[in-house]
UniProtKB/Swiss-Prot annotation:
Alphabetized GO MF terms: GTP cyclohydrolase activity; GTP cyclohydrolase I activity
Function: Converts GTP to 7,8-dihydroneopterin triphosphate.
The enzyme's E.C. designation: 3.5.4.16
EC main group: hydrolase
Name the record gives this protein: GTP cyclohydrolase FolE2
Pfam families with a match to the protein in the record: GCHY-1
Pathway: Cofactor biosynthesis; 7,8-dihydroneopterin triphosphate biosynthesis; 7,8-dihydroneopterin triphosphate from GTP: step 1/1
PANTHER family per the UniProt record, alphabetical: GTP CYCLOHYDROLASE MPTA
Family indicated by similarity: Belongs to the GTP cyclohydrolase IV family.
Sorted UniProt keywords: Hydrolase
Example of a GO biological process term: tetrahydrofolate biosynthetic process
Length: 311
């Protein structure tokens, strides 16, 4: 009796002959070493690894080879160069399958410590969902970095309507008065400044950029800061009253429709990336539905409508 363990993926042909574009594994739990990750330098990630299967007669690929390669390469710090090496190793490991393409996806949250708006020495942690996609085909590698950034959006129309109500209330209460002291006006505003308030809401921008060849690092923090600077109203972590007041001022100075947010991001990204995509979503506090907008570079042409996930 043979003691050799059977491997039917190799010894048995496929009953249905057809090449497969991608075969592999997804949702693999694995630690990733990331120099930008605070405080430990390691993040818990979910990975996908796949190769093509062009030989139609083969029953399957060697999944364990892909897992071992992923595990071995992710012992190194994450970098574009390391992912390129992993992709080539995946293709080489499936030479007997005729594989010519491989792709990897990593999804994780990176924790970044961000300072408060005004309070000296005060800072807090914010979590940013990150996804990195890498693909190699015919000797050419492509990589994409995607992040989610949370921010606040205050409706310009609602702000205008609120100002109108406040103006009318002031005019009605001071009808017939030809002269008002500055102190009296200031006191009236202190009591009635919230006569009507515009609606605002937490919002999210999902930004994806294509990385150029030979880039040395993913530089996630730089992309986060670029997006938050463009939007001007990123959500905060640690706050005191002085920081909350500063945040209120930023929202008042940066009233935004969803279209405004998308265009702000487009302007900044277009100056630094040849190919990018932006999807913004405002979780409306006035409506029972969300407002969304998308934009991208000229190289970013067609996208299916994204599946909605309630939050």
């Amino acid at each position: 009796m043979s003691t050799t363990l059977p491997d039917i993926a190799v010894t048995e042909p496929s009953a249905l002959h057809a090449p497969l574009r991608w075969v592999g594994m997804q949702d693999i739990a694995i630690p990733v070493r990331l120099d930008e990750a605070e405080p430990s330098g390691t993040v818990a990630a979910r990975a996908q690894v796949q190769v093509d299967l062009p030989r139609p007669e083969l029953k399957g690929i060697h999944m364990s080879r892909l897992y071992r390669l992923l595990d071995r390469h992710l012992e190194q710090p994450l970098s574009p160069a390391m992912l390129s090496q992993l992709l080539q190793a995946m293709i080489d490991s499936h030479a007997d399958c005729g594989s010519r393409a491989a792709r990897v996806s990593l999804a994780f949250e990176v924790m970044l410590r961000m300072p408060a708006l005004r309070s000296e020495g005060l800072a807090g942690w914010r979590a940013y969902p990150v996804r990195i996609d890498a693909q190699s085909r015919a000797g050419r590698s492509e990589m994409r970095l995607q992040i989610d950034v949370l921010y606040a959006s205050t409706c310009p129309c609602s702000a205008a309507l609120s100002r109108q109500l406040l103006s009318k209330a002031f005019a009605q209460q001071h009808a017939g008065q030809t002269a008002l002291r500055v102190e009296d006006v200031a006191q009236w505003l202190q009591r009635n400044g919230s006569y009507a308030t515009p609606h605002s809401q937490r919002s999210v921008a999902q930004v994806r950029v294509d990385l150029v060849a030979r880039v040395q690092s993913f530089d996630i923090r730089a992309l986060v800061l670029l997006c938050e600077s463009a939007l001007a109203t990123p959500v905060q972590a640690a706050v005191r009253r002085i920081d909350e007041q500063a945040f209120a001022r930023l929202n008042g100075a940066n009233l935004m429709y969803v279209e405004d947010a998308a265009r702000r991001l487009r302007k900044e990204l277009a100056e630094r990336y040849a190919s990018f995509h932006v999807a913004v979503r405002h979780f409306e506090s006035l409506h029972a539905h969300d407002a969304v907008a998308e934009t991208g570079s000229d190289a970013d042409v067609f996208h299916m409508i994204a599946e909605s996930h309630g939050q």
